[in-house]
Amino acid sequence: MRILHTSDWHLGQNFYSKSREAEHQAFLDWLLETAQTHQVDAIIVAGDVFDTGSPPSYARTLYNRFVVNLQQTGCHLVVLAGNHDSVATLNESRDIMAFLNTTVVASAGHAPQILPRRDGTPGAVLCPIPFLRPRDIITSQAGLNGIEKQQHLLAAITDYYQQHYADACKLRGDQPLPIIATGHLTTVGASKSDAVRDIYIGTLDAFPAQNFPPADYIALGHIHRAQIIGGMEHVRYCGSPIPLSFDECGKSKYVHLVTFSNGKLESVENLNVPVTQPMAVLKGDLASITAQLEQWRDVSQEPPVWLDIEITTDEYLHDIHRKIQALTESLPVEVLLVRRSREQRERVLASQQRETLSELSVEEVFNRRLALEELDESQQQRLQHLFTTTLHTLAGEH
């Protein structure tokens, strides 16, 4: 039995006004080819198929087309909802997808099922667990403090997993089949990126890996970096197939090829997802940024490299966007973001904490707040104009 474990596609993501359609199409084409090359029996998508609950039409088209194309290979597809996915959006096509060799699990309450091989014979028992919304697995109790609510939710998630595993064992019976569980959540020790949202805000930071049942493989989603959890080879995040934030660029992206033999996990192989949209982060003062940009001088690059430029100088030049534009206009790059480095923003805030509002004019307060935002020059000018207009209007009323 062979499966491909993938997650966090985030189809339809708007990345600093840029579409990811071409990247996602290339990934899905590669995934289809990979499934055929390795004669995979099933593909498990562990949540966040879409980036929003109301994905754009092109994202739905990518999803639907992939399902249709995969159906022709005999490979079964399992789609589980993540915290970004809408239950209603996934469920609206669930019945049709069932006729296309695809199982859609959008919410809690789905019992374990037999996952077939390509030839139709039983290959594994699947505990199809999506992102567990608290309202689906616990009832609200009045009078609980924050710690008690956290413990209540932790116990409910643990019980849900343990019950599903017990049901899977009953379904397996005496058959030599592996048990595969899924999940879309943060586990203790997982390394997150900037694009990952906290999903149990104020109640549960992370789920302890030791609370998972002893399934043969646990396919996790939500964390965008591939990693093994708790030193356990069978508990893994595969990560997203493309970088979803600039702090993910430069790191390899994977899909896991998981092989089972005689009802047990045999191997997990990391398959590198090809990069189709180069991205880079440049850090330094203006002189350093200028030097770093030279690496693309006289280079033929298609598509252009998407850049995040972090300025580390103490003085954040007011015309930095214009200077960066002049430096890059003849290079095969596209600057999506120009900002102070995080360390610099923190230093600015720390230095300003010694001042009080009474020492600053209204204009100074606004300008300092505006400088902390990651906006391009036109956006800054528009906000400055709106602020000035509002200030003059208020002055005229008093």
Predicted features along the sequence, with ranges:
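Conserved beta-sheet core of the metallophosphoesterase superfamily
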Residues: 187-189, 193-264
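Catalytic-core regions built around general acid/base machinery
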Residues: 62-74, 204-214
